[in-house]
């Protein structure tokens, strides 16, 4: 394969959920800059329109629709819209949408449990399931789940959130094996604290940021573009032999054990 084709998404199609903020927006822009035609969604029409106008002004080929990914019939409508936009074929599915409620396990309500599960896990499973025919029809498919290091190690971000992310990590491995014969690769990206709206309130607290940084070997919080670059790579032809992997983007957090500088 020619080098330029290995590092290009020209002619490819992509669906990115939750693409108007944070990591999702960075992924939309990254894929579009590599040449992909992208469709994304948001629950907020005004926010979506503002993004679409901005992308158009910057020469990026992006379309969009309103969708609450936690609602089953809206997910089905989203896939129908993507199918119509891309003539029944989809090369890339990025399951990015997510939410969280931070509180002790004993304080969660059944409604909060259902909301986090339906948004983070059920949406990703169902969208992958109903997008499968489109991914298979494209001849070369790639799914990327946006998980979290909370699915790998304990964080105080909440047990339900961690459970959904751990499930995504295993779903990645299962689909990678089950759908390999359909030429669909499945991978997962697990970020640590990234500057997004999901955690912006936390990152406004100096003591919290200092605690995060103290456990992060690279000594800082991550940027959305540092996640989207890996997501894009996992969709490129250059990554064609990579599947079933859960890759942390965490500044070294998950490999940081105990260290203590001994005084002479």
From Swiss-Prot:
Matches recorded under CDD domains: TR_SDR_c
GO molecular function: oxidoreductase activity
Keywords attached to this entry: NADP, Oxidoreductase
Entry binding sites for NADP(+): 15-39
InterPro entries recorded: NAD(P)-bd_dom_sf, Sc_DH/Rdtase_CS, SDR_fam, TR
Pfam families listed in its UniProt record: adh_short_C2 (PF13561)
Residue numbers binding substrate: 148
Gene Ontology CC: plasma membrane
Active-site residue list: 161
Keyword Ion transport set for record: no
Family annotation (Gene3D superfamilies): NAD(P)-binding Rossmann-like Domain (3.40.50.720)
Homology family: Belongs to the short-chain dehydrogenases/reductases (SDR) family. SDR65C subfamily.
Record PANTHER family: NADP-DEPENDENT MANNITOL DEHYDROGENASE (PTHR42898:SF6), TROPINONE REDUCTASE (PTHR42898)
Name the UniProt record assigns to this protein: Tropinone reductase homolog At5g06060
């Amino acid at each position: 394969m020619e080098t330029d084709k290995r590092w290009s998404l020209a002619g490819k199609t992509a669906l990115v959920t939750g693409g108007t903020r944070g990591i999702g927006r960075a992924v939309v822009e990254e894929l579009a800059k590599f040449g992909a035609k992208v469709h994304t969604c948001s629950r907020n029409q005004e926010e979506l329109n503002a993004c679409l106008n901005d992308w158009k002004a910057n020469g990026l080929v992006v379309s969009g629709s309103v969708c609450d990914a936690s609602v089953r019939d809206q997910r089905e409508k989203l896939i129908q819209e993507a199918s119509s936009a891309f003539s029944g074929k989809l090369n890339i599915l990025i399951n990015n949408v997510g939410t969280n409620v931070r509180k002790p396990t004993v304080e969660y309500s059944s409604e909060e449990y259902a909301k986090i599960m339906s948004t983070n896990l059920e949406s990703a499973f169902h969208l992958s399931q109903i997008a499968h025919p489109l991914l298979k029809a494209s001849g070369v498919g790639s799914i990327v789940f946006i998980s979290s290091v909370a699915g790998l190690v304990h964080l105080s971000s909440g047990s339900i959130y961690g459970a959904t992310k751990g499930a995504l990590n295993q779903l990645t491995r299962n689909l990678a094996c089950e759908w390999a014969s359909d030429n669909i690769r499945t991978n997962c990206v697990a970020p640590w604290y990234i500057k997004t709206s999901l955690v912006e309130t936390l990152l406004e607290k100096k003591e919290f940021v200092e605690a995060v940084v103290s456990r992060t070997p690279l000594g800082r919080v991550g940027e959305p573009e540092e996640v989207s670059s890996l997501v894009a790579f996992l969709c490129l032809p250059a990554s064609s032999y990579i599947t079933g992997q859960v890759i942390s983007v965490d500044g070294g957090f998950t490999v940081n054990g105990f260290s203590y500088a001994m005084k002479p």
